[in-house]
Regions:
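Phosphate-group recognition and catalysis centered on beta-loop-alpha active-site segments
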Residues: 1-316
């Protein structure tokens, strides 16, 4: 109920563990997931991909080198179109790397293993599933976890409820899949997509329960631009979502970094060039924006827990 009805819990901000608790264990590993559960995370977020023989497993990168003792790429593509490489037999005995880069004792986890670990304990958010949604969904359904699992991807990839519904066959599965979907919306779309609000409204009307809203600074149109929807004017798009009792999700980076621009282990994401303009890591700023997020995705759970408890935002 906390996830589905954020308006009923104004003093409780949910915490999602980004790739588990990878401060002490390899990211997207089973022990990282268990550690996050033990710390009290409300949700675990992890990334999935698949082998060329259709085994779904946890891995963020396109290649093996940064995170495992293996080498080479495992997927290639863009948007919701990918090619996959390496069989599960080639992958299952690789060792995951610690944050230091050294090999650990842990192996890649299958999605089935990760979901089974989370079942009846914690909510789940699955990232990078856009090319494997039907397979992911039917596995979640077979485990009896459709009310416990969400998945997310950019709204550009699936801009309408119908684009999600067409991935599965029967009406009930279609309804449930839309309910599980968390569209990710970047602030720049406020200018680039004139139909953005109508698309978001269509998802809400179809049962979608939350959006990951990516805004970086005070001047972002998500914070500054009034919106008028069905004759009602709102301060900004976030306040409209709040009025609709729809969850707002944000992902700030580590709080001790400069303007959110710290990059772990010198691994550079070439598609991101923030240039000191990202204020999401400043939690004081984030929670004082016109509508503070109802759920924060974090790499540093222990710090965020303490912070939210101190300001009275972990009270049910």
């Amino acid at each position: 109920d906390v996830f589905n009805n954020p308006a009923n819990y104004p003093n409780y901000i949910m915490i999602s563990a980004h790739r588990g608790y990878w401060k002490d264990y390899p990211e997207n590993s089973l022990p990282a997931i268990q550690a996050a559960i033990d710390l009290g995370a409300d949700m675990i977020e992890f990334d999935i991909t698949k082998s060329d023989d259709d085994v779904l497993y946890l891995l963020h990168d396109y290649g093996l080198d940064r995170l495992t003792t293996g080498h080479g790429i495992v997927r290639k593509g863009e948007g919701a179109t990918f090619e996959y490489y390496k069989s599960w037999d080639e992958l299952k005995n690789l060792k995951l790397k610690e944050v230091t880069g050294e090999a650990s004792e842990y192996k890649l986890a299958t999605l089935r293993e990760a979901l089974s670990m989370c079942k009846n304990k914690v909510l789940v958010s699955i990232d990078k599933a856009e090319n494997v949604i039907p397979q992911m969904y039917y596995l979640v359904k077979s485990l009896g976890m459709v009310e416990q699992v969400t998945f997310k991807t950019k709204i550009q990839f699936f801009p309408t409820p119908e684009s999600i519904k067409q991935l599965v066959k029967n009406t009930e599965d279609q309804r449930q899949l839309v309910k599980m979907f968390t569209p990710t919306v970047y602030s720049e779309l406020m200018d680039k997509d004139p139909d953005l609000i109508s698309k978001m409204k269509a998802f809400i009307d179809a049962g979608c329960e939350g959006f990951e809203m990516i805004y970086f600074q005070d001047s972002d149109p998500m914070l500054t631009r009034q919106v008028t929807i069905e004759g009602q004017t709102y301060t900004n798009i976030l306040n409209w979502l709040k009025a609709k009792n729809t969850r707002v999700i944000q992902f700030p980076m580590w709080p001790e970094t400069e303007k959110g621009c710290w990059v772990p282990r010198k691994f550079k994401y070439s598609i991101i060039n923030l240039k000191g303009t990202d204020r999401r890591c400043d939690w004081d700023w984030l929670l004082k924006t016109s509508h503070a997020p109802d759920l924060i995705i974090s790499d540093r759970l222990e710090i965020l827990f303490d912070y939210l408890q101190t300001i009275g935002k972990r009270t049910l």
